[in-house]
């Protein structure tokens, strides 16, 4: 429920000696949406048209990544069951990460991952980085508009355990 590196950089092991050289490490930005297309490609199947991810099998085989993604996006929407976690949008490149919070938090974050891989220094207010921050923020919002991410997905939900807060007079 956050866009920090320990939640994003999840290790993955792949074993297929017929296709993948032993000891191969992929440094490119791969996402969970890429796993199914990769398995399908390894099985000789075409990716389904509605799938958003891409096969990273060429990367596993040691191929070049000239046309591989240069950034990843993140979106997490507030949930009733986790009220302390805000809606979060983010974009990450090889070097920078911009995180946009919505709600009462509203303290956005910007990190230089080359200089600060543990994300301990928020650079959001640094004057010399404002052009980069604006560029990533615009890119993030362009992506959200293209993918429908600006429409907050609300589920029909009734939580009887807590009742109707208007009528319960407690929160």
What are these regions (language model features)?
Residues 70-74, 158:
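WW-domain-binding short linear motifs
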Residues 1-50, 54-66, 94:
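Substrate-binding rim/cap in mid-to-C-terminal beta-strand-loop elements of soluble/periplasmic
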Residues 7, 88, 95-96, 108:
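Structural motif
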Residues 99-103:
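Short beta-strand micro-motifs enriched in acidic
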Residues 13, 88-90, 110:
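Conserved hydrophobic/aromatic beta-strand scaffold that supports enzyme active sites
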Residues 83-85:
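Residues that act as N-cap/strand-start positions at coil-to-secondary-structure junctions
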Residues 123-171:
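Long, internal low-complexity/basic segments
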Residues 116:
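Intrinsically disordered, low-complexity polar regions and short flexible loop motifs
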């Amino acid at each position: 429920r956050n866009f920090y590196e320990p939640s994003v950089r999840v290790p993955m092991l792949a074993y297929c000696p017929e296709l993948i050289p032993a000891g191969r490490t992929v440094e490119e930005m791969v996402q969970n949406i890429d796993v199914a297309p990769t398995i399908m490609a390894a099985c000789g199947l075409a990716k389904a048209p509605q799938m958003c991810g891409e096969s990273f099998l060429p990367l596993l085989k040691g191929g070049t990544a000239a046309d591989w993604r240069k950034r990843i996006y993140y979106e997490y929407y507030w949930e009733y069951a986790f009220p302390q976690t805000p809606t979060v949008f983010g974009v990450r490149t090889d070097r920078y990460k911009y995180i946009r919070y919505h709600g009462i938090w509203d303290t956005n974050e910007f990190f230089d991952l080359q200089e600060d891989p543990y994300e301990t220094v928020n650079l959001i207010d640094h004057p010399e980085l404002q052009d980069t921050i604006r560029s990533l923020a615009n890119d993030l919002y362009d992506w959200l508009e293209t993918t429908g991410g600006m429409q907050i997905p609300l589920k029909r939900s009734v939580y009887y355990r807590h009742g109707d807060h208007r009528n319960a007079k407690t929160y």
